[in-house]
Amino acid sequence: AGAACPLKDDAAAIVERIVAADAIAFATPIYFFEMAGQMKTLLDRSNPAYAADPAFRDVYLLATAADEDAHAFDGATKGLQGWGDCFEQARLVGVVTATGVDAPGAIEKRLHEVNRARLMGCGV
């Protein structure tokens, strides 16, 4: 396994859970055509998982954006795909996106996307 992270916060415990998980679902709002900084930081902080032979195989992404352009998700999807490519056994198997989500509760009006996410979750 890799060296312990010198930062003392809850990231190490989260990474331990990621390593032990059968599947991982990441959710993020899209800011400036990219995943939220907190998600990117978690992916970066998961570096010790690389040497840990993680259990997870399937990786999922759920993302919302205020923008109406479906390409708003390309950066986040590519970033998560790149992270997953570092783990031989992992694959990005599901992505659900919702455009026009710009306020608290706005996703509730996006029944198609909510149902797609629910169905994807039932398949895990």
Language-model-detected regions and their locations in the chain:
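Helix-loop-strand module that forms the ligand-binding subsite of alpha/beta enzymes
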Residues: 6-88
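Glycine-rich phosphate/pyrophosphate-binding loop and the adjoining helix
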Residues: 85-124
